[in-house]
């Protein structure tokens, strides 16, 4: 998602003409009418050497993740970031593999990609500091630029986009803050930040009122001189400008939220199409619940005006072309009319002193802000079965605490194991090695909650209570998915949330403080530690 494409765009649908101009077959239209979720599979990419890779598959207490981004080039070809495999994959409009670019040694983790006349831009959010690189189609490096302070992970870095002249833009908190980083030729310029995108001299932005506001189902789209009010059936978690067309029409991605007490957070992501005068033209649904793994940048607009989705499956990924209509049926959970709000009980028997939220967040911050010199032995020394965290290069001072599967180290403990001892920093392999130190996702939350023993993502549920509403989240609460991953909630963001977590996601391989959109936490449960102070 987060794609700004200034390409020609065709009208996708016209109900007024009885779908005569849509190009849909009778079978395609029937499927669409029945499900409200129509799409065309453009092509399929396998898993493996000739395709994409996943990490953490079928491993308890390990997040499964895969490709982070894709984009459509001006010639209609597709670029897919095989983030786990450390590659860019280039496909023709028909899905034929045109080439592969090996990114190992250039970046830590490819988290966004854009195709411009100046070259192929790749965002690396996992490196220290984060950076962008510019590549030729044959993989030759044309430029490599560190992002300055203010454009880092802890500042809300979420993606990159292209301006209408081909200049590179850096996005924070979606489209809440957009900074021009280069000119159209790819040369860095003095940073200029706006609260949205500039298109033909006008400011375009989409903002939800906020889950903790008095109007959580409302939002506003600013389109130059136009103000478009949006009201949704369910809570509006976020909105973002997706892209523009040649007639100044534009697309907006929305996320509606609901909490199912049995299955966790539900996210309905849709794309709305507006003409230059702000007239609503149609809507299409992105099947978030069907995704095998979350794709951070999973929407793109092509030169033919189509909206594409990168859909993940256990044995493949598919590139879909969305089909638009005038309206969609709701798919989110509706609580029974007779239901009463759930109460939050303190079930921590025998515990004398509660843990304050300030203590929880202070502990989390101490992991993220830790600074430690790591020797070549700490980084590359012998440690059978260990897989080194990807952000670690040569000897030097690194911030944070490394991810270590099964790890439960305190900050001071980790630092002491590094020096004067000579243990190894982190292990992203899924076996416990006595020679490596660090902390995994549930070990990190266990420490922030001041627990004396490590809990798993599943046993954390034994000492916490599920919240009756996603809007009730406070600092120090968690979003948890038993057997998979857990994050520590910090605050609501512009169109998503801020959290602390120890994770291998996006090749971070350490404790990070990041901003994410709600789609990332589809299927997670909001929970509160039973012994947190009121």
Task: Please give the residue ranges for each predicted region.
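Mobile, glycine-rich extracellular loop/lid and propeptide segments
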Residues: 437-446, 466, 486-489
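Eukaryotic scaffold repeat domains enriched in small/polar residues
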Residues: 22-344
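N-terminal capping segments
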Residues: 343-440
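Low-complexity, Gly/Ser/Thr/Pro-rich intrinsically disordered linker/tail segments
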Residues: 339-341, 515-534
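Bacterial N-terminal signal peptides that target proteins for export
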Residues: 1-8
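Short beta-strand-to-coil "C-cap" segments at the C-terminal boundary of structured domains/repeats
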Residues: 319-330, 490-492, 527-534
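...with weaker cross-activation on analogous glycine-rich loops/strands in unrelated enzymes
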Residues: 451-512
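Bacterial N-terminal signal peptides
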Residues: 8-18
């Amino acid at each position: 998602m987060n794609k700004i494409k200034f390409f020609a765009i065709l009208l996708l649908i016209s109900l007024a003409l009885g779908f005569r101009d849509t190009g849909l077959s009778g079978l395609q239209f029937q499927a669409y009418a029945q499900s409200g979720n129509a799409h065309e599979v453009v092509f399929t990419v396998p898993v493996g050497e000739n395709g994409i890779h996943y990490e953490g598959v079928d491993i308890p207490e390990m997040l499964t993740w895969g490709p982070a981004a894709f984009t459509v080039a001006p010639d209609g070809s597709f670029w897919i970031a095989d983030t786990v495999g450390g590659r860019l994959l280039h496909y023709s409009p028909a899905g034929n593999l045109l080439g592969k670019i090996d990114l190992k040694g250039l970046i830590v983790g490819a988290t966004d990609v854009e195709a411009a006349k100046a070259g192929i831009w790749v965002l690396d959010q996992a490196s220290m500091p984060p950076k962008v690189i510019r590549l030729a189609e044959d993989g030759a490096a044309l430029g490599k630029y560190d992002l300055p302070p203010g454009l880092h992970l802890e500042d809300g870095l979420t993606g990159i986009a292209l301006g209408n002249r081909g200049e590179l833009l850096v996005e924070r908190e979606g489209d809440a803050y957009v900074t021009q980083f280069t000119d159209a030729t790819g040369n860095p310029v003095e940073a200029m930040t706006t609260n949205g995108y500039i298109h033909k001299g006008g400011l375009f932005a989409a903002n939800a009122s906020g889950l903790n506001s008095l109007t959580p189902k409302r939002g506003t789209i600013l389109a130059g001189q136009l103000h478009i009010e949006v009201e949704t059936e369910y809570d509006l978690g976020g909105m973002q400008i997706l892209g523009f067309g040649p007639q100044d029409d534009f697309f907006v991605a929305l996320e509606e939220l609901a909490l199912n007490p049995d299955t966790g957070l539900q996210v309905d992501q849709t794309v709305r199409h507006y003409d230059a005068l702000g007239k609503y033209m149609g809507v299409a649904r992105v099947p978030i619940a069907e995704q095998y793994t979350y794709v951070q940048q999973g929407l793109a607009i092509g030169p033919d005006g189509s909206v594409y989705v990168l859909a993940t499956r256990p044995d493949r990924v598919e590139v879909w072309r969305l089909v638009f209509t005038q309206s969609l049926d709701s798919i989110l959970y509706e609580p029974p009319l007779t239901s009463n709000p759930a109460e939050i009980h303190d079930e921590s028997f025998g515990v004398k002193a509660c843990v304050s939220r300030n203590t929880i967040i202070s502990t989390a911050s101490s992991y993220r802000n830790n600074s430690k010199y790591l020797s070549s032995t700490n980084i590359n020394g012998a440690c059978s079965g260990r897989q080194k965290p990807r952000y670690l290069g040569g000897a030097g001072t690194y911030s944070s605490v490394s991810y270590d599967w099964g790890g439960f180290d305190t900050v001071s403990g980790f630092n002491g194991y590094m020096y004067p001892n000579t243990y190894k920093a982190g292990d992203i392999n899924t076996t416990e090695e006595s020679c490596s130190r660090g902390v995994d996702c549930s070990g990190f939350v266990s420490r922030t909650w001041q627990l004396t023993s490590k809990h798993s993502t599943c046993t954390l549920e034994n000492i916490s209570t599920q919240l009756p509403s996603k809007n009730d989240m406070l600092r120090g609460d968690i979003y948890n998915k038993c057997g998979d991953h857990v994050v520590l909630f910090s605050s609501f963001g512009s169109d998503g949330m801020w959290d602390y977590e120890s994770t291998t996601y996006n090749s971070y391989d350490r404790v990070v403080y990041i901003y994410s959109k709600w789609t990332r936490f589809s299927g997670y449960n909001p929970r509160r530690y039973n012994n947190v102070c009121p």
